[in-house]
């Protein structure tokens, strides 16, 4: 199973990010358009640069505000998608993420969205590309992976699949076991991110307080078990938006992220050994037993 990390998860310029990701042991990365807008190279050169580091581009993202738009906005959305297809072909990857629309003029309706994605799937197929649909926790009409899956199911196109994100599912307190009913081959990509259990706007918490798996309060093991039970065999990828990480040392953050993914997969394997997981041999767990030292601190008249 391939490991991946979003470039936005770590600090540094683009070259520093690539070096850190490769050194940590990841197989690939999620690339954002901002990466090469700020980098002095065209998309084709960026793709070559990534592959020269022994990495692959696992997904290009994000493409926003696509589905459910009335004309002429709908026609413009398809034009935008075609331009993005040009871009990802130059990069040398085949998968693009579309997140659920937040556009104020987007119209709800499962069948309407499914029709949009079926047409987009036809366009993607002509280019040998795939499109994954992800439900944002704050999406205007679609904010639940169950609705996103129903749209993908009704779109009924081999080049259209579902993208899951642990934060978007668990932060909304959606039962992760609902994922088990989804065919694994229709899940194109999975993002992993933990977060603290704090009462905060979902968007703001996502953009500033995501954590590595195991560093927050979300049921990462339950989510991952559900995903793997579907037979999913695509990349496992970190997508961490965190202000401290963006200000930290790239290599340190990348290494911590890689270790967190391995630890999560090991936890899942121990919890449900029957799941088909490729996990490196890990040392036996050491359990703390009792206390050997306690230190107290006081100040002033305390």
Predicted regions and their residues:
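Boundary/entry segment of secreted carbohydrate-active catalytic domains
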Residues: 1-14, 291
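Structural preference for beta-strand elements that scaffold enzyme active sites
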Residues: 2-4, 28-30, 54-61, 94-97, ...
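Conserved, mostly hydrophobic/aromatic
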Residues: 5, 21, 29, 50, ...
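Active-site beta-loop-alpha junctions enriched in small/polar residues
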Residues: 6-10, 32-34, 62-65, 101-103, ...
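Active-site acidic/histidine proton-transfer and metal-coordination neighborhood
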Residues: 13-16, 56, 67-162, 171, ...
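Acidic (Asp/Glu)-rich catalytic clusters
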Residues: 18-23, 38-61, 82-92, 115-126, ...
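Acidic/histidine-rich catalytic cores of soluble enzymes
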Residues: 28-29, 119-217
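Core segments of cupin and vicinal oxygen chelate
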Residues: 35, 295-302
